[in-house]
Amino acid sequence: MKKIAIDLMGGDFAPAEILAGALSFAKDFKDVELYLVGIEDNFKNVSLPENCKKVTVEDYLPMDIKPTEALRRKKSTMYQSCKLVKENVVDAVVSAGNTGALLACATFVVGRMKNIERPTLAVPIPTKDGFCVLADAGANIDVKPSTLLQFGVMGVEYAKFLGIKNPKVGLLNVGTEENKGTQKEQEAFKLLKEHFKKNFMGNVEGNDINMGKVDVVVADGFHGNIAMKTMEGTAKLIVDVLKSNIKKNIISAIGALLMKSVFNRLKEKLDPRKYGGTFFVGVNGIVVKAHGNSDRIAIYHALKVAKDGIEASLTSNIEEAIRNVWNSRYGRD
């Protein structure tokens, strides 16, 4: 039986929405055992199904906590959830808590994979024909060129997990020419080209991401996060503009009614709740970061992401890919 720990106190709507999403998931997936990690008050007047275990701890982390402080508070729901992965009690952990705190716990409690310089936050981004993977989406602000190569390798494994065959890789930059960007980007360009060969499509710009020019977009966390947040804002703008214009007159309202199925598909594609969560890849276990404002629907899907990651052996696939890169570059493991 697959086992997943969930941090009941992580997120803007914790614990009510987190618990509701977890219980809904437990009802639908009897082959998964959930470890509900929370404080005593979380479990008052709550009837748990057979495939849910209560793990009571003394502390929880606020959403504005610093990563260093998160590591010191070892009795928190997030820390203890990650510890369950470290001790092989569970196969995965899900949290909607502070991103920096979860990255710290993933890195130093769950532990980095051998030869990994930095774990990365790899995020699926909607494109016109499906998805691409953005790595890194905000976990590592400043990185080395060799780290960007590792982000590309891990991003490719994640893309394969999403069902993308023979993923194409691009480096996020300020232009498509090979000599664009800082020295870091220029050196990373050479490393990515050497490793991925024909599957490296060169530099890509922000406006290429949603068009599906590549399947994996490599970036440091600073630029990757800006790109992701810009896309989220643009998606919200599109939905808001459509809503406001539909209400302007009867003709618009009739047109909207006729195009209801189209709008529903657009809403579905742009709804972040349906993606649930994404992986911190490069650590010794499945660590899923759900959005901070996750409701019960988003938590349900985040747990589904964790379940799928376990079943696809995502961690071992990434570990093998990184080992191959390391051996090819340095001739040793």
From Swiss-Prot:
Pathway this chain belongs to: Lipid metabolism; phospholipid metabolism
HAMAP family in the cross-refs: PlsX (MF_00019)
Entry EC number(s): 2.3.1.274
Broad class of enzyme this protein falls into: transferase
Gene name linked to the record: plsX
Subunit-level organization: Homodimer. Probably interacts with PlsY.
Keywords noted in UniProt: Cytoplasm, Lipid biosynthesis, Lipid metabolism, Phospholipid biosynthesis, Phospholipid metabolism, Transferase
Presence of keyword Ligase: no
GO molecular function: phosphate:acyl-[acyl carrier protein] acyltransferase activity
Protein task: Catalyzes the reversible formation of acyl-phosphate (acyl-PO(4)) from acyl-[acyl-carrier-protein] (acyl-ACP). This enzyme utilizes acyl-ACP as fatty acyl donor, but not acyl-CoA.
UniProt protein name: Phosphate acyltransferase
GO CC, one annotated term: cytoplasm
Catalytic reaction annotation: a fatty acyl-[ACP] + phosphate = an acyl phosphate + holo-[ACP]
Pfam families found in the cross-reference section: FA_synthesis
